A protein has these predicted regions:
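Acidic, Mg2+-coordinating catalytic module of metal-dependent nucleases/exonucleases
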Residues: 117-140
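Short, small-residue-biased leader/transition segments that mark boundaries at the very start
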Residues: 3-8
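Mg2+-dependent endonuclease catalytic cores in nucleic-acid-processing enzymes, primarily RNase H-like
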Residues: 9-120, 139, 149-151
Length: 151
């Protein structure tokens, strides 16, 4: 069996329309991505599956887009597991990611109703981490090759 190696995030792109007081268009985000990736060879871009127009913009520009697995609770659990196993680490350069890890909290009102979900505030970097970990590093179901026949 192949051991998965550690993933190191050594840089980040971060923009908050709320903090900056101005939203960007999908084209502006795509321009930023191209500039940020300058000279970097990538296989694909992982995107929130709800961002249909951004996916269309990236596809139009020739990027291969992977729609992120977006189950929040399971994604958070997997991120916690990978962090504890040191399968993902973050450089000090990733200040916004580190800041968001420190401020990521569970929604108390949702918990009163039996829901596990985080407060949806200052979570752009956390969403990006969760999308990567859950979509790319998530456990794949293994086939039992010893069993013959159907389901």
């Amino acid at each position: 069996r192949r051991q998965r190696q550690m993933c190191i995030r050594d840089r980040e792109y971060y923009y908050s329309g709320r903090e900056e007081g101005q939203q960007k268009t999908d084209a502006e985000y795509a321009d930023d991505l191209e500039s940020w990736l300058s000279g970097t060879d990538i296989n694909a871009v992982i995107v929130d599956p709800a961002a249909a127009s951004f996916i269309a913009e990236l596809t139009k520009r020739g990027y291969r887009v992977i729609k992120a697995k977006n189950d929040v609770a399971d994604g958070i659990r997997l991120v916690a597991t990978k962090l504890n196993l040191l399968k993902i680490v973050f450089s000090n350069i990733c200040q916004d990611t580190i800041k968001e890890f420190a401020s990521y909290i569970w929604d108390a009102k949702a918990a009163e109703h039996g829901e596990d979900k985080p407060v949806k505030q200052y979570d752009h970097a956390m969403d990006a981490v969760r999308y990567f970990v859950y979509t790319i590093l998530g456990e794949r179901p293994r086939l039992n090759r010893k069993v013959k026949g159907g389901i």
